Amino acid sequence: MNSYIIMKEEFGWKQYQVYGLNFWFKGYLLGTSLDEVIQQAIDLYQKGTVTMNSVSVWARGLRGHFALVLESENFAIAIVDKDRSIPLFYSTEKTGSLVSSYAPDLLQKLQLDTSSINYQAALEIAMSGYTIGCKSLYEPILQLVAGSFLLYQNDKLKVESYYNYQPWKLRETSEKELKFNLTEITLNMMKDMINSLDGRQAVIPLSAGNDSRLIASALKELNYKNVHCVSYGLKGNFEAETAKLIAE
């Protein structure tokens, strides 16, 4: 298989070698452990046939902020989370496929120069600070977008989304139900955070705004006591004074 995984144990990436697999991971998981996810990767490998659907089902079951790369002698898989909080880059310019967590490594491997610049992407960066879609500043280098994965197998690379954020799809329901759903989602997120804290202190940069107030209120609702709120700025400023009242 002509796949080239250019990964290094740096910037938080860790490599695990099991059952002839190279498994790279960065980030953290919710509701499961890394050992369980590695076992899922082994199970996927031992089934023999890996399909886009089987990878999609696997990816949909993962929660947290993470990215992973899985390589065997027959296939390569790369997955980013629903936010793409940790980037992964790929290219098919040369024979086979290249995957890396660090775009400059692909740039060097492909020996790209200014003739390969994607000027549409450059315009997007100049106007907004980032590119749109899977583009990068160089034409041959692409990136996995939020909620997507790639599968390289039988000398073919396929990219697919396992999750699409579609807020424009409205669902008619009552205001009461919407409030209930929002409360349930918010408290579940906070429960995940409490589990990840594992008893450690939660430090909240508290202001007069609703965002930090929501976090403080939810931790209070869930009876998490190891909380410290901080504010900053000029003495007596409105934000700090209001935050003090909220904290008390």
Please name every model-derived segment:
Residues 1-248:
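Cysteine-centered catalytic environments shared across enzyme families
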